[in-house]
Amino acid sequence: MPTPSYPGVYVEETSGGVRPLTVASTSTAAFVGLAERGPVSATRVTNWTEFQRLYGSFSSEGLLAHSVFQYFNNGGRQCYVVRVTRAEARTASVSLRNRAEEPVPGLTFSAMSPGAWGNTLVLSIEDGTEDPGNTFKVSVRRQADPAVVPPGLGATDPVEEFDNLTTDPGSSRFVSSVLDAESEFIRAVILEQNTAVQRGLLRGGGAPELPLDTPVTFQINVDGDGFQDVTLPEEVGTVTSPEAAATAVQDAVRALTRKKESTDAAAFTSFTCEAEGEGEEVRLVLRSGTAAPTSSVRVQPAEFDGAADRLKLSLAAGGRPEDGSALRRPVNADLVQIGDAAVQGDVTAVAPGIDGTTEVPEAMFAEALGRLDNITDFSLLAVPGIGTPAMMNAGMAYCANRPLRDVFYIGETRREDITPEQAAVFRRGLTAPNSYGALYFPWVKALDPTGQSRDPIMLPPSGYIAGVYARIDASRGVWKAPAGTEASLNGVVGVATELSDVQHGTLNPINVDVIRRFPQAGVVVFGARTVSSDPQWQYVPVRRTAIMLRVSIYYGIQWAVFEPNDEPLWSQLRLSIGSFMTTLYRQGAFQGASASQAFFVKCDEETTTQTDIDNGVVNVLVGFAPLKPAEFVVVKISQKAGMASG
């Protein structure tokens, strides 16, 4: 607080006492299904363009792409995608030799996910830009259809480029780490047999300028020992032969003493400098006396002396260092197609990508749900096109058994279920119905986005429905039923089955939510029931409102953990949660003419006994009066007797 020292006004910031709670998102969906390509782990996607970039577009690999497109088309903002692959799917890869004199397989580049799509990737390897002797650059291109275009022809411009990569795991540019973090197409693995080392060297950037003006001094760093001054004898001023200059450099460096005990003395005692090449192509080549991954040679000018530049050994003069591990880099290669068994040359192994042809069993889709276990910011789940009772049972069970029970499953009947009787049979096939799922019937008709069919195609409704959920949540709130004339479906031309009111009346009582077409409203969702038989949780908005409250309160009161368990804490909890509930009530989230009728928050000595306190437990009781949709609007019309005329 301020310390008053003069007459005037002092302003101090204080805590308001209320810790605000944030309303949890309720409209982020997760989709599980087959895709042309893409990661198999749960991956966030924020728009259709991003989905296409990661997973490909519409394909025969399933209806996942169609459903995600319609999710965004109907109001969805972001979603997670879990790609399922066939059991026999394989990842395309190619292994390249290292740069040793007796080369061995050095690196394996592979597509980032299984499938034949990886066979369209084309790689080019070249020296890195900043340090060409030790690093390399990888360019990734997409090939046209490999079935009709010869390898290496028709490749597009690079879709990705990664420069200055290294095989050193300790480097920030380690190839595997960089590709894992940044590439949308490829991964890389250093093979175990890639252990080649050499004596670290420095190759001059040109023929030395002889004779040299004396005195001749430059600085050298061998094996990371630190830079030291190297002074050549005065006789070097008369030397015109590169071989003689090389001998002078070698003798001077060998006379140095290591600065660090950790440096191998042989780095200096066995140091060599040779003149390699002839005529204008002659170069001085300096080599450390040790052969190890960290072996290296660096030269820089000494102060006020340009000898390093005249000897062409400095980086500015074109000197090119190659460290001991430089041989582990992949050989330079141009347009190597991943997965193409016909590729030869420096390629040591190829594995083509395979999609597989067998039908994916439902169990694989159910197992894939587990990849969402660590994702906490989604609240809707769908497995488009896999409409079976077993799949819906698995989906609802997954939602109900998540630790926070924070997800709602959007189910659908089978494509071939086109009659109300078949939909009823499907509903009766749900062996473990609960309030964490809703069943929608029938499928919808839409124009084929690929243009392959002139007639409308059949699509599962779950992607559309998830988009409607998101749209209604944003415009009206999660407590508004995602149904009615407001819940129109964008991107449809009809439904698989046109139902009458009588037929609809046979499905609504057994909690099958129907999609219908009306003359004025178009195709709309006209049902908002969960598949639960519990009247308390019969309606979709009631369950989803409860999910929203649970998640919001859970994350909003984390601050209370380890606070002193007494009335001050209880009062803060009542105040924070009560303020949150009041805000929702004012937005129309609950039933009741007053806040006291709409909800209550209780946290006191009745909810938290001394035994609870001794066990470290504080109990908060929150109740709310949910809004339930008006399914049946009954209008009674009667005649009013006319007044007698006088």
What do these predicted regions represent?
Residues E161-F162, G353, L404, A432:
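Intrinsically disordered, low-complexity peptide-like regions
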Residues A144-E182, K259-I338:
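Acidic, small/polar residue-enriched beta-strand/turn segments
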Residues M1-P103, L107-M112, D131-G133, R141-A144, ...:
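Structured, hydrophobic secondary-structure cores that serve as assembly/anchoring elements
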Residues V148, F174, N221, D229, ...:
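Detector for intrinsically disordered, low-structure N-terminal pre-sequences
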Residues A326-F365:
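Long, low-complexity, polar/charged, intrinsically disordered or flexibly structured peripheral segments
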